[in-house]
Amino acid sequence: NSPLAAEGPATGLERELLQPFAEQLPDEIFQADWEPPRTEDYRALRENLIRAQRLLEEAGWQLEDGVRRKNGKALRFDILLASKGFERIMAPFVYNLEKLGIDASYRTVDLSIYQRRMNSFDFDMMVYSFGQSQSPGNELMNMFHSSSAERAGSRNLMGVSDPVVDA
């Protein structure tokens, strides 16, 4: 729903920019339209959970007594929320993670605590909305460039530090 949205496989200047990184990227970038997983009904959700289970196992996370473990360490994380309104969204998400053997929990904190923890990257996962202008520009460097990955207060909350993204 934007003239700036990518459609289909990479072509033209986009393909030229990404070509040096082809070995590091999924083939779909150059061959097909990417589609995110869908969960319109229980069958699609079940298929996604089966795929997630397979990916976890391929990455070395085995199910032991109902808990995903790798090298003896349980797969667990906390989700930081700034509003109780997100709890109704997180509850089914955490429930589905539990089906996979992932020990996840969520916690709503005061906005000032949320902001402080966000600015110092003191979280495992959080809910955050990245506002964009109609014509994205320099703000993308602060959100996704390696130079901002460890800079306190940046909006690179994911810690993205990758030459492919920087290109």
Regions found by a protein language model. Give the residues of each.
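Short helix/loop segment immediately N-terminal to the Walker
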Residues: Q62-A74
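Short, well-ordered beta-strand elements
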Residues: K73-S83, A104-R107, D124
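Extracytoplasmic/peripheral linker and loop segments enriched in polar/acidic and small residues
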Residues: N1, A5-G8, G12, E16-E40, ...
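Beta->alpha turn/N-cap motifs
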Residues: Y128-S133
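Short, charged, surface-exposed secondary-structure boundary motifs
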Residues: S135-L140
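Bilobed "Venus flytrap"/periplasmic-binding protein-like clamshell domains
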Residues: L49-L55, A59, L80-F93
